Amino acid sequence: MKDLLNLLKNQGQVEEFDAIRIGLASPEMIRSWSFGEVKKPETINYRTFKPERDGLFCAKIFGPVKDYECLCGKYKRLKHRGVICEKCGVEVALAKVRRERMAHIELASPVAHIWFLKSLPSRIGLLMDMTLRDIERVLYFESYVVIDPGMTTLEKGQLLNDEQYFEALEEFGDDFDARMGAEAVRELLHAIDLEHEIGRLREEIPQTNSETKIKKLSKRLKLMEAFQGSGNLPEWMVLTVLPVLPPDLRPLVPLDGGRFATSDLNDLYRRVINRNNRLKRLLDLSAPDIIVRNEKRMLQEAVDALLDNGRRGRAITGSNKRPLKSLADMIKGKQGRFRQNLLGKRVDYSGRSVITVGPTLRLHQCGLPKKMALELFKPFIFGKLEMRGLATTIKAAKKMVERELPEVWDVLAEVIREHPVLLNRAPTLHRLGIQAFEPVLIEGKAIQLHPLVCAAYNADFDGDQMAVHVPLTLEAQLEARALMMSTNNILSPANGEPIIVPSQDVVLGLYYMTREAINAKGEGRVFADLQEVDRVFRAGEAALHAKVKVRIHETVNDRDGGSVKNTRIVDTTVGRALLFQVVPAGLSYDVVNQPMKKKAISKLINQCYRVVGLKETVIFADQLMYTGFAYSTISGVSIGVNDFVIPDEKARIIDAATEEVKEIESQYASGLVTQGEKYNKVIDLWSKANDEVSKAMMSNLSKERVIDRHGVEVDQESFNSMYMMADSGARGSAAQIRQLAGMRGLMAKPDGSIIETPITANFREGLSVLQYFISTHGARKGLADTALKTANSGYLTRRLVDVAQDLVVTEVDCGTEHGLLMTPHIEGGDVVEPLGERVLGRVIARDVFKPGTEEIIVPAGTLVDEKWVEFIELNSIDEVIVRSPISCETRYGICAKCYGRDLARGHQVNIGEAVGVIAAQSIGEPGTQLTMRTFHIGGAASRTSAADSVQVKNGGTVRLHNLKHVERVDGHLVAVSRSGELAIADDFGRERERYKLPYGAVISVKEGDKVDAGSIVAKWDPHTHPIVTEMKGTVTYVGMEEGITIKRQTDELTGMTNIEVLDAKDRPAAGKDIRPAVKMVGLDGKDLLLPGTDVPAQYFLPANALVGVADGAQIAIGDVIARIPQETSKTRDITGGLPRVADLFEARRPKEASILAEVSGTIAFGKETKGKRRLVITPNDGSDPYEELIPKWRHLNVFEGEQVNRGEVISDGPSDPHDILRLLGVSALAKYIVNEIQDVYRLQGVKINDKHIETILRQMLRKVEIAESGDSSFIKGDQMELTHVLVENERLGADDKFVSKFTRVLLGITKASLSTESFISAASFQETTRVLTEAAVTGKRDYLRGLKENVVVGRLIPAGTGLAYHSERKRRREMDKPTRVSASEVEAALTEALNSSGN
């Protein structure tokens, strides 16, 4: 028997599984799970509190209430294990079997499962090809349905009401079978022949022409194939047996006072059992049909409520009027099983307390209160005490600890040594929200935190609390030390910059220390070395800010790992020389020879990390902190009312502004300007005045007059406390100082519009009642916004994590040659992000050549580090193709080469890194810093006049990019394409700026010309759209009849006459269909052809076009024939901040999106239909023309006869990402989305690496739509996983069959999360019911590839150290295959053992 137990014990480890399958349960399967039938609705006896027999808590079915004790108490020991008591029928076993044993209820009449009925699209409806309304009428006993028409005229599946049924009975007698209720539905489902139906549908689909019908049929076909493939039978969607949940999962808990708290499920089960028993009785009595029917309907409703309360009709409510929680409610939502218990668990060995500053700690330490440590490390202390022989038993050790004897503290100190603990601060927005530290025991009750890690935790000391967790196992301690230690997390995973940077006091101290003052004590002295400076300063012979000369010895490391020693004399200050003492060897003196503001310090730490490595940097960071604290204390910087110096010019500026406003008011009163103009002008005026005041104030604050050594008065940078705080970046900003010492400025109303009268006072002067009242709006809005923002930002992060959670680095190189083309990011002519920054940490996809030669300077496959970046900049390369997560060809996961550098470590990413989650956290974490509001253009916000020329900022060489142009007689070029760009390159060939050139721009320079800074190189009229000729010839008017299609008008000011084309709706009847045009003819009177085509050169004129040339006039190349006035585009609200990011990631189609050309070809306009214009594009390759109807109000940028390329903008508007993907491909989409998202973050000063956005994009592009199915089993129009399709195509290609063709599809992150391969991950995200219903019907398998699924089933995640565990597990299983015991062998062993034990 012992062997048998061992055998079972070994088989009990269910960890060894690779997939989880979900399906429909057949009645037989439900019975096989069951340990008995629940026949009575009773729960427990009210006197004895023992479970009733055959009731919902029956001990005979579910097992004993107490461990190893039957209900009547006859058997009470472990030795009786497995015995079944003959008196009460209870098996003697552990009480916890009541958590796992299920029961069942035999239903007297079948019941449809509400999930498959009502969860849209209704699965039962699809299979039976009936509408949901009809099926409900049958199920809830309103109509009969014909099951077998026999030889009658009725049809199968036809609905009959009572009257029709009785008529049919009279007419046909028993020749047909029609029933109602779930049994009828079950019969119909049972009768479906899947094979036959699938064959019929596969034939029918290709013969159908209507799109909607094809959609409907292919939906049905998919469902049928799913049923056929999964082995589920359709009739299982109707229940005949109902499983009952184990009682301990729906407990009945006694409260004090003799009352009971019960789970709602018990009420719901009771209802079902009561109705079921009543129905059985009625059937036995053969009661009248109408009563039985009513009871059956009530049973159906009771089961519906149990499975998913409230899905149909009104929810059943309990005694307190709230709806009961059904089985479906148990698993869905934030409080459901998935999110509450499976994904977020509570942890033992943890504690929490308030945090305070630990300025004396080292970076890897934290202060842990003794009381907490004693409690957290209890088991370790017990063990140590016993080992030492200080306590004989655990009990004795416990007593010692409770008494807090002196030995206990010694043991505690020993236990804690080198045992890291994890500190976590909620909300944990990114992985740096949990880090490991070595505990240092402290008195008191607050945890001490190292100041430098505050930035990572986003912590401050105003009452924040943090949690401590103890890693127990050796492996956990190892991971905590090697991966999570605060000293290993110097760089931020979001952008690779240091996150351990000093802030506030430390910055102020270092800044104060490195400032210089004129005529300070000891100015002009020369020192032999740093030690001498130190001695003189300590002796008080030289002031901290004195300008001195010092001889220094420095060791400078170069990039190749070598180092150079040199000695030189530098001009510096005493403070900087003192600071250089803590700088590690290898860095040059120049890094500290400047006022150390926040940015400079950050740069210093970054440089230190790259040059001398991690260990030195950590020591250096600590030294910086200690130094900073020391000197900020010495500086005595504080703040007093006299620091707010109000500028003298303030009154004058405000008076002048008030005068101007009065002037505008009087103009408005006399009707010269409109209300809107007045409002805008006034607001402009005040914002200008405000800027002037703050300028005057800052120049006042930032300078002070002092007398130098020679007795001359000079200006030096001010030592005003407030100015120093703002200037160093320690606290405050110019905007805040402006409110304290300048003027508060314009305020916004609650609706976001700006109030015309500004607050002219500042806080030092004090606000009047009205001014205070106006300013309360803003303050209140700020708080409300913050609360909303936090919730929204959290939800965005959750969606991002969900879509990217299964993306892990799984291999080193996928071997792809594709990538993204990287160019410098240029905005409005300025280079916002140079190429070097964008390619840093990426792998080059294709060889980079020296410009103008064939010489390879960066070979493909190079990981670009700082050294290579300098090299690329030096050689003035302006475009590089780099590997990207989007183009990676790894099947499951991503490869290390396509991802590139692990930003937080600075080397190539390791296999097993969960890059998806890191990307999601990096994008989501700064979400709370983004603004919520949408910016209105108008008022003082961002108002720019339309650009009408290009004025270069830097001198250099002109480069023209894909610009089609013609040359005018005077040598100027005229742009005749829309996408042309003009760039200026410096002497090294590096691009410094780039501008877009609109159609019709006159360019006064040529490719390769040298220009000076500030010169204007191109001009155009922003308010009209010209039509430019591309050849010379004679103008001939076509269809231009005065009064019918055109009208002449004379300009009063200039006396010039213009011809204006009339709008079609203003023309008389004769002119409705005439299309006025200007035609070009040669000297011989023949039509000229457009260059390179056989299309006659005639320019059709749209409505309102102004023609500037006379009939028969000679014109030259590049002349303007006509101008189309452009209304200034409507000012759209620019959605900014968080909503914009969410829109982009959700891939929402914008309202009134821009219209792009679907094909490359020539534009023509067809016949107009009501309110719409017909645009026809004739492709150049001679394929069929493409037609599109465009609303008349859309302003088009193109005219007849013009050439467009696929994807070019025809009508302006916000871009639709789906169009970009369809017409321009994946890389154009990537460029668009990355730039758009970066723009939002850049506005807030947040840096995020592009690759994180690309990583999320990869997940959004997982799906494809089948365009042609070829020989595959796919159906046209299906959405499939890209990897599936590629695998299938490879298989077909190998067999020389036709492969399927597909187009890429962009899904929003929510949709992408729900359509993932893993149903566990999707169900735990959103729409749990729908996901599970779909998965069950199709019998889906979840291969547990992602992180989330593995957390839910309770295994290590397949990332990081868990990846190694999983691959090792698989390897071991391959080796151990033969030794595994099959189920049949276990059964044989069991019977044998039982037989032998029986004898």
Curated annotation (Swiss-Prot):
Q: Does the keyword RNA-binding apply?
A: no
Q: How is the cofactor bound?
A: Binds 1 Mg(2+) ion per subunit.
Q: Which cofactor does it need?
A: Mg(2+); Zn(2+)
- The UniProt record gives the binding positions of Zn(2+) 1 as C70, C72, C85, C88
Protein residues bound to Zn(2+) 2: C814, C888, C895, C898
> Which EC class is the enzyme in?
transferase
An example Pfam family from this entry, by short name, is RNA_pol_Rpb1_3
Annotated EC = 2.7.7.6
Statement: the UniProt record of this protein carries the keyword Transferase:
yes
Q: Which residues bind Mg(2+)?
A: D460, D462, D464
Tell me the superkingdom of the source: Bacteria
Q: Name one GO biological process term.
A: DNA-templated transcription
Q: Which UniProt keywords apply?
A: DNA-directed RNA polymerase, Magnesium, Metal-binding, Nucleotidyltransferase, Transcription, Transferase, Zinc
> What does the similarity note say?
Belongs to the RNA polymerase beta' chain family.
Q: Kindly give the HAMAP family that the UniProt entry links to this protein.
A: RNApol_bact_RpoC
UniProt function note: DNA-dependent RNA polymerase catalyzes the transcription of DNA into RNA using the four ribonucleoside triphosphates as substrates.
The molecule here is called DNA-directed RNA polymerase subunit beta'
Gene name linked to the record:
rpoC
